[in-house]
């Protein structure tokens, strides 16, 4: 048992996360889980979170009925799962002793050298939690002067040294941060935007810190530093920054969700030559550059996927939001609302109706983790006709909310991850200002013709992924859209539309959607290939395209495309290709390319190897040949490569200086492949090598015991796994656990590895 304690922002989570993510640490444990403990968490939810992560880590199905289990039952399941396993569990940001008391009985002490770590702001909790196990308490201290200076300069001057004429000013400002890393990073974000030649600007910042920062309270000092960061924001960014207060603590914010919400709220100013989405991305980039928001996850091609706000930053944002009557956060049923409320974010439980509170000015209503559904009319009996944002994501909703019919000003409607099945035409047709309709992971399969009345609609997401184990051909449910979809001229995202309807009319209509950035098509017929290509040629702003044929053996004919969209970055093709479209070679911006069930007769690598920005390539049953050759000096930017179900593949060769940036290689279900790629030892940047259901004959060639003649070729790769789909879950074995007879499946079962990437636009 190890407890790490210290004030908020001192780096407890950062330190423990660095240890937790270290491959040399993780290889010692069979199961690992990181659980973030929110300030208002419930014990049952905490245990469910721990259980789900553990089952996910060892790739086992989650037990049925877990959502309704009591805490005692959950503890028993977790304890049984971890019994006789060496595990590592981290509880981040524990606030109360009873939280630790509740979960510790679920963690068995089987003398397997397991480790439990907690981070907490409370030193008494840190001490008391370690008494029983004679554990250790690590009281994290502020950075030393030289460490703080190094961090400050790295963030302020992007790795360069501080100019001599600014040293005194910078050291004065740095002293006010008192070694608190979060404060240092925040103020560095402000200073990094300043002209290094204007000493007067820097001196003004130095003087504006004010007398309050000289107090003894470290939180007060940090508030002052953050106020400086906030006050330095351009006017258009202040609302965007305050908007982060609506999300719960430790919530992973989806980048595109935030972008669309900002636009719906009216925070994004239009600029000539740019869409509002482009401008919003510029806003986000500036907040990231100022270190006021953190990247939580990225895609394989380097795009920001999720974001988060440090909890201490969030607390101060909430205070500012409250002071300015910007938004109200409700966490308890009895919580009183302000007299006038503009934005309401409900976390965990719906508030009681407050008859005497006016919501006539309510602009936005969002719910997070709410376990019950109450119709809007009952929740707000006095009316809410000015609502522009209604976010019901993950709500226990079964029917389309009828009250929406009166929301003429509504711009953003999300029913994602609900059980809604239909969209009433007489209701949706009234929402003339709607810009985003998010029905992802619902049961909606058709949009009514009334949708064509929504001329401002920019984003339509109506699809559901169905993944279990290996990718299946029909892994997505899309939607039937009105054949005259081309009337929605403002559309930027349309996913996923079934194309085999109305005699291909919808295919011809797609060319009218000149603003499209992302397009997903299902069930494209071979005979519609020419019409589809003519439409795609007109979509010059397209960044991502996903096309799936009617069936695994059905042909996608894209050979008629002469001028592909010049900015295409992501291309996903599922279905038989008689030949690889030659225009793919001209896609200089292409970063991700997935080819599934292509069954090409000729080696596609020859046509793909010179794509200058290709970072992620996935090939599933894409080629019928027996050899794949990655030529020397080619695929210069490739970072992720997946090869799956090549039925005839017998040999893979990697030339010298090929794929010099490759970090992850996955090879699966290639039954005739009996040895690892020749030249794999040249892939010096490779971090992960994973085999999926590959023959034992291949695995024995890299076995550390016995006849493993190729073991030395993969010795430089930190993580080598052999993975098998068994009984509805993934069994994962590390190379160094293979048994003496070199049978990977008789080795030691370890934690799960990163799940296979989904195919999406």
Predicted regions and their residues:
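Post-nucleotide-binding-loop coupling segment downstream of the phosphate-binding loop, primarily
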Residues: 2-10, 14-77, 260-262
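Short, conserved phosphate/pyrophosphate- and ester-handling motifs at nucleotide-, phospho-/glycolipid
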Residues: 12-13, 65, 92, 180, ...
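A conserved switch/coupling segment of P-loop NTPase cores
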Residues: 18-28, 71-143
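Mid-core helix/loop region of P-loop NTP-binding domains shared across ATPases and GTPases
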Residues: 43-49, 59-90, 95, 169-179, ...
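Non-catalytic, charged helical/coil tracts that couple and regulate nucleotide-powered enzyme cores
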Residues: 50, 54-68, 112-114, 120-239, ...
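Cross-kingdom leucine-rich repeat
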Residues: 79-82, 87-88, 110-111, 332-342, ...
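Surface-exposed helical/coil interface segments that assemble multiprotein signaling complexes
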Residues: 108-111, 163, 190-240, 245-406, ...
């Amino acid at each position: 048992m190890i407890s790490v304690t210290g004030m908020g922002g001192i780096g407890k989570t950062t330190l423990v996360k660095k240890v937790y993510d270290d491959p040399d640490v993780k290889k010692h444990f069979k199961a690992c889980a990181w659980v973030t403990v929110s300030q208002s968490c419930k014990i049952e939810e905490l245990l469910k979170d721990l259980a789900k992560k553990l089952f996910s880590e060892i790739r086992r199905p989650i037990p049925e009925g877990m959502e309704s289990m009591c805490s005692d039952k959950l503890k028993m399941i977790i304890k049984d799962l971890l019994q006789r396993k060496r595990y590592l569990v981290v509880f981040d940001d524990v606030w109360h002793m009873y939280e630790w008391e509740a979960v510790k009985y679920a963690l068995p002490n089987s003398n397997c050298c397991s480790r439990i770590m907690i981070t907490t702001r409370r030193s008494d909790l840190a001490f008391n939690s370690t008494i029983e196990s004679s554990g250790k308490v690590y009281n994290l201290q502020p950075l030393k002067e030289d460490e703080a200076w190094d961090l400050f300069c790295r963030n302020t001057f992007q790795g360069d040294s501080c100019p001599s004429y600014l040293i005194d000013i910078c050291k004065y400002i740095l002293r006010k941060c008192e070694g608190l890393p979060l404060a240092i990073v925040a103020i560095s974000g402000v200073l990094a935007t300043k002209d290094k030649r204007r000493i007067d600007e820097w001196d003004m910042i130095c003087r504006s810190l004010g007398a309050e920062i000289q107090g003894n309270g470290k939180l007060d000092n940090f508030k002052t530093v953050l106020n400086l960061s906030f006050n330095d924001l351009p006017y258009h960014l202040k609302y965007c920054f305050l908007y982060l207060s609506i999300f719960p603590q430790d919530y992973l914010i989806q980048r595109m969700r935030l972008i669309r919400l900002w636009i719906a709220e009216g925070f994004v100013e239009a600029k000539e030559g740019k869409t509002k989405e482009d401008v919003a991305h510029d806003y986000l980039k500036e907040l990231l550059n100022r270190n006021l928001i953190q990247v939580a996850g990225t895609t394989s091609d380097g795009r920001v996927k999720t974001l988060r706000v440090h909890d201490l930053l969030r607390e101060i944002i909430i205070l500012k939001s409250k002071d300015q009557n910007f938004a109200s956060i409700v966490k308890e049923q009895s919580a009183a609302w302000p007299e006038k409320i503009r934005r309401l974010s409900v976390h965990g439980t719906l508030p009681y109706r407050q008859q005497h509170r006016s919501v006539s000015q309510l602009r936005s209503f969002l719910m997070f983790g709410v376990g019950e559904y109450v119709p809007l009319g009952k929740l707000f009996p006095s009316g809410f006709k000015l609502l522009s944002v209604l976010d019901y994501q993950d709500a226990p909703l079964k029917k389309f909310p009828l009250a929406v019919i009166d929301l003429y000003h509504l711009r953003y409607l999300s029913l994602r991850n609900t059980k809604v099945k239909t969209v009433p035409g007489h209701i949706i047709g009234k929402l003339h200002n709607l810009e985003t309709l998010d029905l992802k992971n619902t049961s909606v399969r058709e949009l009514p013709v009334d949708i064509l009345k929504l001329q401002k609609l920019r984003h339509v997401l109506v699809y559901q992924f169905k993944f279990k184990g290996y990718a299946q051909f029909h892994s997505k449910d899309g939607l039937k859209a009105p054949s005259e979809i081309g009337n929605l001229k403002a559309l930027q995202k349309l996913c996923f539309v079934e194309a085999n309807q109305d005699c291909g009319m919808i295919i011809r209509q797609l060319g009218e959607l000149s603003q499209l950035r992302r397009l997903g098509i299902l069930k494209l017929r071979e005979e519609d290939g020419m019409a589809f290509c003519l439409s795609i040629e007109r979509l010059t702003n397209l960044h991502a395209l996903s096309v799936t044929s009617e069936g695994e053996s059905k042909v996608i004919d894209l050979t008629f495309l002469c001028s592909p969209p010049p900015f295409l970055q992501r291309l996903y093709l599922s279905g038989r290709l008689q030949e690889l479209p030659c225009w793919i070679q001209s896609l200089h911006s292409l970063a991700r390319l997935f080819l599934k069930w292509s069954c090409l007769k000729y080696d596609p690598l020859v046509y793909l190897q010179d794509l200058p920005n290709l970072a992620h390539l996935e090939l599933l049953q894409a080629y019928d040949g027996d050899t794949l050759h990655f030529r020397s000096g080619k695929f210069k930017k490739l970072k992720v490569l997946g090869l799956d179900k090549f039925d005839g593949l017998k040999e893979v060769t990697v030339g010298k200086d090929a794929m010099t940036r490759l970090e992850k290689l996955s090879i699966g279900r290639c039954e005739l492949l009996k040895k690892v790629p020749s030249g794999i030892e040249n892939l010096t940047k490779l971090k992960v090598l994973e085999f999926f259901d590959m023959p034992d004959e291949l695995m024995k060639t890299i076995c550390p015991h016995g006849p493993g003649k190729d073991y030395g070729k993969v010795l430089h790769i930190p993580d080598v796994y052999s993975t098998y789909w068994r009984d509805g879950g993934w069994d994962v074995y590390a190379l160094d656990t293979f048994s003496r007879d070199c049978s990977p499946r008789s080795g030691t079962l370890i934690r799960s590895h990163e799940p296979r990437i989904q195919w999406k636009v």
